[in-house]
Each structure stands twice: as structure tokens, then as C-alpha cells.
Amino acid sequence: MNVTVATELTRAVLGLSLKELNEKASSAPIGSEGIILLPYFNGERTPPLPNATASFLGLSSTNYTPENLCRAAMEGATLGLRYGLDVLKAQGIEPDEIRLVGGGAKSRLWRQMASEIFDLPVIRPKSEEAGAMGAALQAMWCYLTEKEGGASLKELTNDFVSLDEDSRALSGISEAIQYADIYQHYTQLKEKLWDSIEN
């Protein structure tokens, strides 16, 4: 997945531990002083750009710092997820909360950043094995649908997924507005890349 690839490659090239990556990213301002990462290290799935490559854009002699690169890696990956959320919204899906899973979900900074970029509350499940839990819930849903006439996935998740309330992050108005502008710029850059690859 590109989400952790972006931060792991940035962390590795800078020779940082995960803790140091978070500390450096925390000390950079929202927007990484103008640096945006298009995090397509392995192409991209949404939008479908399998041949796309990653790019750090907006670099200058004054903003090219480890702190800004770390934050831009986190922001770029999360802005990519926001694009996927917008695709879902265009299909009529309107979430009122984001449940963040995986290694990044352990980072308080990343949860807060995700909340501000999505402009929605973000929380993580108590279970760290989200993939296995999701597979088990899907299997249970299939079984109940076949044997007992159906079940609601929402009811199953409400019954079997516990949330870590201490992990909840809420978006601030000022931060959400800043990230809305950054997301618009990110989307414009992504579309230019898409056009150049398609043509």
C-alpha cells in the first residue's frame, strides 16, 4: 500500500526511527511549507495510474528540510486517501467518522492530520488486526446471508468492532480550512500528472 510506502521510504532515506519521523513531522507546519508529495511510489490505484511515479513538488532552498519532508510524506499519503473518500462520496456514501487502521493509526499526529484532511472525526479500533477482523466479518456476513436470510454489515461491525475512544481525533476549523486549500492544490497537481500519463 502506498500509505506506508511513502513514510517508510522517507524514514529510511533520512535514517530515522519511526519515533523520529513523527517528531520531525510534528515540528513542521501544516502544508510542509509548500511541499506536496504525490506518493505514487508503486503507481496508484485511485485514480488508476499504474505507471505513475512519486514526486515531491514545491521544493526550495528554504523549505527542503527533514521536518518538511517527513510531514509532506504523511500529508501526501493522507491526501491520496482523501481522494478515495471523495470518490465514495460521489457514489452517495457519506461517512460521519473515519476508522483508521494499520501502523499509521498508532500515530497521534497522523490521526489528527487525517481528521483535519477528511474534516471528520477519526478513531482507531481496539483490535490491531483489522484485516483479519474485516475478513472474519465478511465471512460471517456471507454465512448469515446464505443460512439465515441476511445480516447487516453495520450491525455486525457494531456488535464486533470495539473502538479505542482515547484515540479519537477531531478536526479544528482553521486546520480543516488550511487542508482544504492544500487538497485542492494536490488535486490539481494529480490531474496534471494524470493528463501527462494518459496522453
Spell out what each predicted region is:
Residues 1-199:
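Glycine/Thr-rich phosphate-binding loops that ligate phosphate moieties of nucleotide
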